[in-house]
Swiss-Prot record:
Enzymatic reactions: (R)-pantoate + beta-alanine + ATP = (R)-pantothenate + AMP + diphosphate + H(+)
Note: The reaction proceeds by a bi uni uni bi ping pong mechanism.
Lineage of origin: Bacteria, Pseudomonadati, Pseudomonadota, Gammaproteobacteria, Lysobacterales
Entry EC no(s): 6.3.2.1
Statement: the UniProt record of this protein carries the keyword Repeat: no
Family the UniProt entry places it in: Belongs to the pantothenate synthetase family.
Binding-site positions, ATP: 31-38, 150-153, 179, 187-190
Official protein name in the record: Pantothenate synthetase
GO biological process: pantothenate biosynthetic process
Encoding gene per record: panC
Signal peptide bounds: none
UniProt: beta-alanine binding residues: 62
SUPFAM superfamilies: Nucleotidylyl transferase
Species per Swiss-Prot/TrEMBL record: Xanthomonas euvesicatoria pv. vesicatoria (strain 85-10)
UniProt: (R)-pantoate binding residues: 62, 156
Length: 280
């Protein structure tokens, strides 16, 4: 049966007990309102560890002033049931005072230069500083051997990998595959904001990503691929933040480059901001 913890000393006692038994511990950080994508991360983590801790904490420092912190959906009972079914051993539920004992205004910030300054970093200034700051705290609290993050947030995964390498966290970072709805829409806690009229249109993002991959593979210059993607999304009713092709480190590839790439899209449909990507 899953254990629910709200006290940091109790969490550390539990994890230390596991480690004394020689068990590997994994962490799956979340903000709650969980879905099949989150549960797939628990199952992925289980393949690399003997015990899995998931955290649920809606982190105020990664939301901008006009973003949806106050209305971010919170579904604790459903989250607990789903985590238990997925094989999670412990649920860590810190409050804001536990996570930020000196208050958010005095929180020691962490910034990952370069990778956090482009794309999402330009659209949501300070977002990745908040992500790094809370993830580093979760790493210190849980002391995991392994941590799993979803590839839907591709840039976030890259930012965390850079932070882990730079700060020498002894933690293996796993990237979990994107889990999609039947029509291709990437699962997200924010999908429930979509109106009934917008929900069928939202799957256009996946179709455009596939078109970007195929067009790029056919030799179309990158700038043309990106312009065509933005136009297709706008014609479908989206307001586009970006539709780009990048290298895995998020730098820009030359048109003659034939190695691994990723197409990334961020766009708004109605009041809902959606992100997705496709590696190829």
């Amino acid at each position: 049966m899953i254990q629910t913890l709200t006290d940091l000393s109790a969490l550390r006692a539990l994890v230390n007990g596991w480690k004394r038994e020689g068990l590997r511990v994994a962490l799956v950080p979340t903000m709650g309102n969980l879905h099949a994508g989150h549960y797939s991360l628990v199952m992925l983590a289980r393949q690399y560890a003997d015990r899995v801790v998931s955290s649920v904490f809606v982190n105020p420092t990664q939301f901008g002033p006009n973003e949806d912190f106050a209305r971010y959906p919170r579904t604790p009972e459903a989250d607990l049931r789903g985590l238990e079914d997925a094989g999670c051993d412990a649920l860590w539920l810190p409050d804001v005072d536990t996570m930020y004992p000196l208050g958010t205004a005095l929180a020691t910030p962490i910034h990952a230069p370069g990778v956090s300054d482009v794309l999402e970093g330009e659209c949501r200034p300070g977002h990745f500083d908040g992500v790094c700051t809370v993830v580093a705290r979760l790493f210190n609290q849980v002391q995991p051997d392994v941590a799993a993050f979803g590839k839907k947030d591709y840039q976030q995964l890259a930012v965390i990998r850079q932070m882990v390498a730079d700060l020498a966290f002894p933690i293996e970072i796993l990237g979990g595959s994107i889990v999609r709805e039947a029509d291709g829409l990437a699962m997200s806690s924010r999908n429930q904001y979509l109106s009934a009229e917008d929900r069928p249109i939202s799957a256009t993002i996946r179709k455009v990503l596939l078109q970007m991959r195929d067009s790029y593979a056919a030799g179309t210059p990158r700038a043309q691929v990106e312009d065509a993607a933005s136009q297709a999304l706008e014609q479908a009713g989206f307001r586009v933040d970006y539709a780009v092709v990048r290298l895995p480190d998020l730098s820009e590839p030359g048109d003659s480059y034939t190695g691994a790439r990723v197409a990334l899209i961020a766009a708004r449909l109605g009041n809902t901001r959606l992100i997705d990507n496709l590696e190829f």
